Amino acid sequence: VASTELQLAQGTRTVLSDTEVDSTAAAGLVTLKRGTDHMKINNPLVKESSFIFITPKTKTNQNLFLLDQKEAEDEEKGSFTVGVDGKANDDIKFNYLIVN
């Protein structure tokens, strides 16, 4: 890919709850809230074959990992879920990047 200005984060983002967000962007910043153990990101770009990269922006001793990944089916949106080992001790901000 050659680009002088690749804008992957263009799109909309709507917070639905402490553990769920709707997004249409290929990249974004999400906060996993203190006291929770996962964050679901609904996104129409997610496919079974997508590579999803997660990068913490907050210093943490807890591990973030891809817990689940689902392609859109019928009326259901595609989604992926990021988990953390145990309940988050503090808010954990992380970037995501969806590559198809």
What residues fall within each predicted segment?
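Extracellular receptor-binding modules and their adjoining Ser/Thr/Gly/Asp/Asn-rich linkers
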Residues: V1-N100
